């Protein structure tokens, strides 16, 4: 007889994810405008002003080149959030882009859904902007609040 499977076994969704084609990772934020790999968390949020942002174009290119899903860095180590987070002053809400009413995450999610492309988000556990970083209990509460906010909108 064949050997017994070793647990845990992937569920149908996990198996589909494992069998899917390539994923494309979008890293976009204030660093795009400062030409730096990692930000310090102190860049003026008004520097974020992607006046020609077209997330549908991103998805079109991803799909054209065979990517079945995309991942967006919703918040990198600098702490700048690409959605208007209620838990920080360091987000698109504090930028001039769309008068502080922009939301890269929502725009990309809509474009991906319309094109039938899967979407994932990366939320850095390190946050160089938030003063509570380093205070484990306070920061964990902050991080979980942002994660919940991001995943339930």
Model-derived regions, located:
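Mature catalytic domains of secreted/periplasmic carbohydrate-active enzymes
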Residues: 1-153
């Amino acid at each position: 007889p064949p050997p017994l499977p070793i647990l845990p076994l992937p569920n149908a969704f996990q198996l589909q994810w494992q069998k899917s084609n390539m994923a494309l990772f979008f890293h976009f934020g204030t660093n795009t405008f400062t030409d730096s790999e990692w930000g310090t968390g102190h860049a003026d949020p008004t520097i974020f002003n992607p006046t020609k942002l077209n997330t549908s174009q991103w998805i079109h290119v991803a799909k054209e080149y065979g990517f079945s899903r995309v991942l967006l860095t919703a918040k990198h180590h600098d702490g700048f959030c690409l959605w208007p987070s209620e838990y920080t002053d360091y987000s698109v809400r504090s930028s001039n882009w769309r008068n502080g009413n922009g939301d890269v995450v929502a725009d990309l999610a809509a474009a991906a859904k319309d094109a039938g492309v899967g979407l994932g988000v990366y939320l850095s556990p390190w946050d160089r902007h938030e003063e509570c970083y380093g205070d484990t209990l306070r920061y964990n509460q902050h991080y979980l609040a942002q994660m919940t906010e991001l995943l339930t909108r």
